[in-house]
């Protein structure tokens, strides 16, 4: 069995028989996948927000609200939230800040420290690849130049 609290991993496992429920589940899967693709984190938050938007949207439409008006309202709200978030965003600059941010995202301080070390070595424009291993523990491997896995 897999134990996870990652929204995208959980969403991938949802399989429903009812066609209407299946549509909803596919919507949630898409929200989680797109969030994971774009941000790499926040899938659980995105899933909860999607559920709230759908629930309240359906409730408002059932009460007689115009669906297109709701859509326009949601789009305006998204613009405002995005603007506010960008204004309050802070650049993560120091190795300690990177480690703290990565540790929160990974849910593990040792992984956060390793990612901060990797970023310190490759810089902001470098590439970091995380792979699963058959061995126990964490390992950092630095490859200078280019690396081709297949050719």
Swiss-Prot record:
GO biological process per UniProt:
protein refolding
| Reaction(s) the record says it catalyses | ATP + H2O + a folded polypeptide = ADP + phosphate + an unfolded polypeptide
Coiled-coil stretches are none
Q: Look up keyword Cytoplasm and say if it applies.
A: yes
Localization terms from the record: Cytoplasm
Q: What is its EC number?
A: 5.6.1.7
Keyword Nucleotide-binding tagged: yes
Record key words, sorted: ATP-binding, Chaperone, Cytoplasm, Isomerase, Nucleotide-binding, Stress response
Q: What is an example of a GO molecular function annotated in this UniProt entry?
A: isomerase activity
GO CC aspect terms: cytoplasm
Write down the Pfam families for this protein, in alphabetical order. Answer: Cpn60_TCP1 (PF00118)
Residues the entry annotates as binding ATP: 41-45
InterPro entries associated with the record: Chaperone_TCP-1 (IPR017998), Cpn60/GroEL (IPR001844), Cpn60/GroEL/TCP-1 (IPR002423), GROEL-like_equatorial_sf (IPR027413), TCP-1-like_intermed_sf (IPR027410)
- Which residues, if any, are the signal sequence? none
Name the family the entry cites.
Belongs to the chaperonin (HSP60) family.
Q: How does it assemble?
A: Forms a cylinder of 14 subunits composed of two heptameric rings stacked back-to-back. Interacts with the co-chaperonin GroES.
Please give the function described in this protein's UniProt entry: Together with its co-chaperonin GroES, plays an essential role in assisting protein folding. The GroEL-GroES system forms a nano-cage that allows encapsulation of the non-native substrate proteins and provides a physical environment optimized to promote and accelerate protein folding.
Mind telling me which PANTHER family this protein's record contains? 60 KDA HEAT SHOCK PROTEIN, MITOCHONDRIAL
Q: What is this protein identified as?
A: Chaperonin GroEL
What is the gene name?
Answer: groEL
């Amino acid at each position: 069995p897999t134990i996870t609290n990652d929204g995208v991993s959980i969403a991938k496992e949802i399989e429903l028989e009812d066609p209407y429920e299946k549509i909803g589940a596919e919507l949630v899967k898409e929200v989680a996948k797109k969030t994971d693709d774009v941000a790499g984190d926040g899938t659980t938050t995105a899933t909860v927000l999607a559920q709230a938007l759908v629930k309240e949207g359906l409730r408002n439409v059932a009460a007689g609200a115009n669906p297109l008006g709701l859509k326009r309202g949601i789009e305006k709200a998204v613009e405002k939230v995005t603007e506010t978030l960008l204004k309050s965003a802070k650049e993560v600059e120091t190795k300690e800040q990177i480690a703290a941010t990565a540790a929160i995202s990974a849910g593990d301080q040792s992984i956060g420290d390793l990612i901060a070390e990797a970023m310190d070595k490759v810089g902001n424009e470098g590439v970091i690849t995380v792979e699963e291993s058959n061995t126990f523990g964490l390992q950092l491997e630095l490859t200078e130049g280019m690396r081709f896995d297949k050719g």
